[in-house]
Amino acid sequence: MPALEITIINKLGLHARAAAKFVGVAGRYPCQVRVGRNPESCVDGKSIMAVMMLAAGKGTNLHLHTEGEQEDEALNALVELINNRFDEGE
């Protein structure tokens, strides 16, 4: 089960469009994706409502972990999305 902590760096944080992109990437993989402000209270990373309820603004540290088939690929894709500022160019 790969896991890591990552900081939200885009200007608007994990707002609706960014959350939709996150869930879209997570949904491409068959593994379980969990995300949260701390490892003990992670939510389903494939649920748009759960991801939006994190209210993760710029500078928020999030814990990501994946488990199951293609877990490494899923984690890498989500890290790339976050590090690319959700492709919002800011």
UniProtKB/Swiss-Prot annotation:
Keywords: Cytoplasm, Phosphotransferase system, Sugar transport, Transport. Coiled coil: none annotated. It comes from the Bacteria. One of its GO terms (biological process) is phosphoenolpyruvate-dependent sugar phosphotransferase system. GO terms for cellular component: cytoplasm. Residues 1-89 form the HPr domain. The keyword Glycoprotein does not apply. The active site is at residue 15. It is found in: Cytoplasm. PANTHER family: PHOSPHOCARRIER PROTEIN HPR, PHOSPHOCARRIER PROTEIN NPR. This is Phosphocarrier protein HPr.
